[in-house]
Every structure is written in C-alpha cells, then in structure tokens.
Amino acid sequence: MRDKIKNARRLIVKVGSALVTNNGAGLDPAALDDWARQIAALRARGREIVLVSSGAIAAGMQRLGWVKRPHEMHRLQAAAAVGQMGLVEAYEKAFSRHGLQTAQILLTHEDLADRTRYLNARSTLVTLLELGVVPIINENDTVVTDEIKFGDNDTLGALVANLVEADTLIILTDQRGLYTADPRRDPGATLISEGRAEDRQYEAMAGGAGSGISKGGMITKIRAAQRAARSGAHTCIASGRETDPLLRLADGEAVGTLLYADSTPLQARKQWLADHLQLAGSLIVDAGAARALDDGRSLLPVGVVEVQGEFKRGAAVACRDEHGTELARGLVNYSSAECRRILRRPTSDIEQLLGYIDEPELIHRDNLVIR
C-alpha cells in the first residue's frame, strides 16, 4: 500500500500550528526551511506540491505577546491578521533559498462551495502548479467566523485535495500517527501503520482536541482522511518532527499512518458528478461532437449547435444530440450567455468574441460523465 504514496504525482502537505510555531514559541524558521528543502527535493523529482499551513493565529498571538488563545472572535481575527504577515514572509524566504517561488492563497469554505469560485480557485491552483510555483494555502481567518470557531486546516487540506484532484494528503503533526488509543494516557497504545480511511473504528480510537496552540485533534485528521478518500485521495498522518518525513514517505517508507482510499481521484470525481449534479440546462451537439464525447474527449464550442436554459459558469449541464438524447453531463466553463456567443466557433475565436478566455473547452473531459 505504501506504493500509493511513492507513486503519487500531486500531493497536499498540511502542516499544523504546533509545528510551525514550535509549540507557540513563535515562528520556527529552521522548521520552515527544512520543509522547503524537502518540498524542493520532491519538486526536482517531478512531484507537484500544495502546502496548507496553519499558524497565522498562533504566530499573531506570539507577536502580540498573548500566552493563551483568546475566545473572543474579534481577537482571534486580529491575531490572524497580524500573524499572516509574518507567516507568509517566513515561507517566502525559506523557499527562495531553495530556488522556489511561492504564492499565497487564502480560502474560505464558501469559496469551495460556490461552483464559480470553486472553478476559479481550481484554475488558479493548477496554473500555479504548471508554473512550478508552490501555493501556500491558509483559511482566511480574518474575515471568516465559523472556520475559526469550528473549522480546521485538516479539513481544508482535504477540500484542497478534492479541488486539485491530488493523489495524496499528508498531514504533518506533533504525533507519530494514529494510535489504537491516546498514547498520552494509555502506555499500551500502538501505532496503526495503515488501513481504509472509511473504516469507522478509527474515529473511536482518535482522542479529543489538540493543544492550546492548535485547534484540531486527531479526530479532525481522521475525518479529513475520510473526506479526502471520497475524492480518491490517500492520507498519511505523520510526525513533522521526525527526520525528512516527506522524503521518506515519497520513497515508500512506512512512516506514520496511511489511510487509503478505495478509488482514484478521477474515478471519485466522475462518480460524484454522476450522483450529485442537478442540471441547469443543456447543450445540443452535432454528430462530430457526439462522437468526441463518446471517445472521452472534451466538448468544444465548435460542436455545439444550441444552448438551452440559463446558467452560470460552473453549472451542471446535459450534453444532448440533435434528437434530444442525453449523451453526457458535466460542469460548463462558460455561462449560457457566453456559450451562445461562441457556439459553432473554433476555440481560437473565444478571446476575440468574449474579450477573454477562461478555458479552451466548454466542458473539460475530467468534468464529464458519459451517460
């Protein structure tokens, strides 16, 4: 099973607050530089890495001289605003020493729930990866309340895995992995090497909340692994304090706990599209486009003869032949109004007709399910 991690091409690495801030003592430049070194080595092997980093609130608390995490929402948000500045600066310096550029992306759950914003975020992240940039993602704690109060970056890491169709989510924490019981209370607890992410017994094994510095505990990591598995991504929970955990995992070494998914990211995505989409309209296609869809290719504007219904970018639409038979369904890259302006036209005309081009196809093949 460890070959699943060894063969992964796109990975999400989530680093917890306790690691980033050395248990609340302040940002730990040496630790950040070490992760940057490992990620640079993985990039050199052809891996694509997205970093999800906690630590803004904890770093802000240290800068403001606060010992205890406050309960008032406005004070948490103030700490996040102060800490995010130092967090991004420290990461930028660390990665630049290893020849890598970084990009800051602050997300909320609303960004990933709204289809248009979801597609925009996905396009940006995929482009950054293609450019060789390391995206550094954090929750936008300054403007979001529910995420600070109830949320955690373990969940965000799983959502980002879905967003970019990652193969693997690696959660680095201050524990070696998942144990059969809380090792701080039960000396007989043993480390679980691997298992199915959807196995419900792991929730019972996970302990309570984390430290006063971090928000989540092991239970949030298990639930994040379950969420990632539904996107087809495997999850490894490992200690960020061990030597070279990322490189050792990439070499197939049995580090931490591997919770594996039952399907690939693309299979999971296709299943989700088939089961959950509510159609907002239809695209009527000609015979050539119908053959292309049957062959598993993307739908281009030139093959569309009619647009039915009113919908926004990111909506689910049916692809039908000229007799009305549904051939496929998927997520459309342009609104109904935009589709009407570019139908029957080659992709090269999109920018001239609209003044911009979001994507070269109306529906990408990865966002299509053949009926």
Swiss-Prot record:
PROSITE patterns listed in its UniProt record: GLUTAMATE_5_KINASE (PS00902), PUA (PS50890)
Pfam families in the cross-refs: AA_kinase (PF00696), PUA (PF01472)
GO biological process, one term: L-proline biosynthetic process
Compartments, record wording: Cytoplasm
Biological pathway: Amino-acid biosynthesis; L-proline biosynthesis; L-glutamate 5-semialdehyde from L-glutamate: step 1/2
E.C. code: 2.7.2.11
Domain PUA, first and last residues per copy: 280-357
UniProt name for this protein: Glutamate 5-kinase
Naturally occurring in which organism (per UniProt): Azoarcus sp. (strain BH72)
Lineage summary: Bacteria, Pseudomonadati, Pseudomonadota, Betaproteobacteria, Rhodocyclales
Gene name for this UniProt entry: proB
